Amino acid sequence: LEARGLRVVLEPMAEMLQYSEHQAWARGDRGGLGDQLERWVRERIFGRCHGPAAKVFGWPEPGPIPEVLEAAAPYMRDALEGETVLSLGVPIRAWRRGEIDGAVLVGPLECMPNKLAEAQLTHVAEREGLLSLALSLNGEPPDPELLDNFAFEVKRRWARRRAAATA
């Protein structure tokens, strides 16, 4: 996608770790003093590492997990634990905040969480306008035409928004 003129931002792995911890606290599996201290140390380390790197690389601030879950809620209940809610909530939140122009969902061939997110992203596109491309990988490179078409549409929409903003 970068070869096609798009700026690509990868979803940070930290969000999955934060989500797993959030779910453990919500279920009541964590909550003691030791858990609170561990959480404080982890958040402090993350902030000290992510903050400076984010400035250099132009990364957006990661969304708090409750905000990510809230963004995904109209499309997927968080009771279905797993990466599907993150695959939906992270790009929806970023789209609503104007941080992205499209989302690419990449997963292994026939991965059920990926299929669920792909199906729901169709509804997100209809209701909110978020352009998305789902790639189910089986070891073969993706079809270049899919990437070309996605990049073309992202650029077209961006140019239209920019023209409307300056008019």
Q: Where does each model-flagged region fall?
A:
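An N-terminal assembly and electron-transfer interface module characteristic of large anaerobic redox
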Residues: L1-A167
